[in-house]
Design a protein with these regions (language model features):
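Compositionally biased terminal segments of proteins
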Residues: 1-38, 42-186
Length: 186
């Protein structure tokens, strides 16, 4: 889906501020406790303190429970585009419910909003599926940490199968395998 804005305006600092406000809106509306998994560029911005920014926050959740009305309130308060936070990724090839299994708690806001980040290896696999220029840049950053942790091509393939059930989305483009092999060489 095309975004309402093309400028990357969401950074670690304002993402934290918006999540804090979102927690306040959740409390105000009384919709209960929420757990959100952040993936994509926003996960990279929150994980790596390299000044990364993004055009939106890609989220995954198991229960929506009127969360979007709170998100729209945050958008109105800060003058953000309606799609500043969205779950479009849940309708993409790179999504898998297995992403929740290894997610890491980033922060809890106001004891009502838990924000999780996709595990580095899962994020790497997601970016292998998408394989856009901005994903390739993120994969460079992720590969450095994965190499340090002894992650090999075989480990990536095993994790890929855990997420997607088979290797089809990896093997559908030979460039992905070659790229991954080159990145994970020690």
């Amino acid at each position: 889906m095309a975004h309402l804005v093309s400028e990357e305006y969401l950074s670690r600092e304002n993402i934290d501020q918006y999540f804090e406000t979102l927690a306040d809106k959740i409390i105000e509306t009384g919709i209960g406790h929420h757990k959100i998994l952040v993936v994509g560029g926003a996960a990279m911005a929150l994980k790596y303190q390299d000044g990364r920014s993004t055009v939106d926050i890609d989220i995954c959740f198991r229960e929506q429970n009127n969360l979007y009305s709170c998100c729209q309130s945050v958008a109105a308060e800060y003058g953000l585009p309606d799609d500043w936070i969205n779950a479009d990724v849940m309708h993409s090839d790179s999504f898998s419910y297995a992403l929740f299994e290894k997610a890491v708690l980033y922060k809890e806001y106001r004891n009502i909003l838990e924000i999780y980040l996709a595990d580095d290896l899962d994020l790497y696999c997601m970016k292998l599926v998408s394989f856009r220029p901005k994903d390739i840049q993120d994969m460079e950053v992720l590969a450095s940490d994965l190499r340090k942790n002894g992650i090999t091509k075989e480990t990536v393939i095993e994790n890929f199968v855990r997420l997607y059930g088979n290797e089809y989305l990896l093997r559908n483009d030979d460039r992905k395998i070659i790229f991954m092999e080159n990145q994970l060489r020690i």
